[in-house]
From Swiss-Prot:
Tissue and organ distribution: Expressed in the shell gland mucosa. Not detected in hen liver, magnum, isthmus, cartilage, bone or in egg white or yolk.
Main location: secreted
Segments forming domain C-type lectin: 12-139
Protein's recorded name: Ovocleidin-17
Molecular function terms, GO-annotated: antigen binding; carbohydrate binding; extracellular matrix protein binding; ion binding; lipopolysaccharide binding; peptidoglycan binding; signaling receptor activity
Keyword terms of this UniProt record: Disulfide bond, Extracellular matrix, Glycoprotein, Lectin, Phosphoprotein, Secreted
Pfam families from the UniProt entry: Lectin_C
Compartments reported by the entry: Secreted, Extracellular space, Extracellular matrix
Disulfide-linked positions: C5-C16, C33-C138, C113-C130
Cellular component GO terms, alphabetical: extracellular matrix; extracellular region; extracellular space; organomineral extracellular matrix
Main function: May form proteinaceous networks during the construction of the eggshell which then may control the deposition of the mineral phase.
């Protein structure tokens, strides 16, 4: 593939994004993403531009009309609050410098793992219980 991403993956400035409709817990989804090679994880979203690309991918993959499958059409990303920690991290270990939390006050209190929301056309995320099974998006090195 000329852009360095495999079939079904979308090139972005930060690597390749892949959407998987299989519904897994956050930790199983992260393990699945790591199989794609060194530096592969559940997607970290570094900027508004990257979030737009990701939202386009998800809306194209899922219809994005509010009728997403699974747990209300949520999609895991790599943001989580590790056990015993008060701060959110990406699954690659980096601190989030960009955020797009859903506007409700409780958006950060629903759990320790973050999922994009179908209701917002995948442009915002909210905390969910990490054991919830959702579709997910991986980011791999190009």
């Amino acid at each position: 593939d000329p852009d360095g991403c495999g079939p079904g993956w979308v090139p972005t400035p930060g690597g390749c994004l892949g959407f998987f409709s299989r519904e897994l817990s956050w930790s199983r989804a992260e393990s699945f993403c790591r199989r794609w090679g060194p530096g592969s994880h559940l997607a970290a979203v570094r900027s508004a531009a990257e979030l737009r690309l990701l939202a386009e991918l998800l809306n194209a993959s899922r219809g994005g009309d509010g009728s997403g499958e699974g747990a209300d059409g949520r999609v895991w990303i790599g943001l989580h609050r590790p056990a015993g920690s008060r701060s959110w991290r990406w699954s690659d270990g980096t601190a989030p410098r960009f955020a797009s939390w859903h506007r409700t006050a409780k958006a950060r209190r629903g759990g320790r793992c973050a999922a994009l929301r179908d209701e917002e056309a995948f442009t915002s995320w909210a905390a969910r219980p990490c054991t919830e099974r959702n579709a997910f998006v991986c980011k791999a090195a190009a």
